[in-house]
Design a protein with these regions (language model features):
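Bacterial N-terminal signal peptides that target proteins for export
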Residues: 1-8
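Long, low-hydrophobicity, acidic/polar, solvent-exposed interaction domains
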Residues: 20-143
Length: 143
């Protein structure tokens, strides 16, 4: 015979186990998303001399981070170097007509020697991140 106390315990346990959530699948990491973009096709961009015609992501390495220039919106998005790959991974496939390649340049304006050091440090970090994600970089001379 089931006692009322045991009955309540069984009801509580069945309600508790029925309310447990299933684990949420992890979203793919930025590198995985970026690998879905075809490799860079230099035949599509090697003839470009005026960078205003560049249609892939364009980066400007600054002392305080990296600017991701969104040509579709004419917007500049400042990100930390370590947040660059997630920001690139959020861009739609239509932003990558040349394949997995970005144009990048150093900010030509330096207020101090520390700015130059910070820009060189950020350039190294960005270069390493992009190389690790198999994204080609077309370095453009600073204006």
């Amino acid at each position: 015979m089931i006692t009322p106390r045991l009955l309540w315990l069984l009801i509580f346990l069945s309600a508790f186990t029925g309310c447990t959530t299933q684990p949420v699948p992890q979203a793919p990491d930025p590198e995985t998303i970026l690998q879905a973009i075809p490799p860079a096709d230099s035949a599509k961009y090697q003839h470009i001399r005026d960078m205003k015609k560049w249609r892939n992501p364009y980066l400007i390495v600054r002392a305080d981070g990296v600017v991701l220039f969104d040509s579709a919106d004419s917007a500049e998005i400042l990100v930390k170097p370590e947040d660059l790959l997630p920001a690139l991974a959020k861009m739609p496939a239509s932003y990558w007509p040349y394949g997995r390649v970005v144009a990048a340049q150093e900010n030509g304006v330096r207020g101090s020697e520390q700015d130059g050091v910070a820009i060189r440090r950020n350039k190294g970090i960005v270069g390493g991140l992009l190389q690790g994600a198999h994204i080609a970089v077309e370095w453009v001379p600073a204006a």
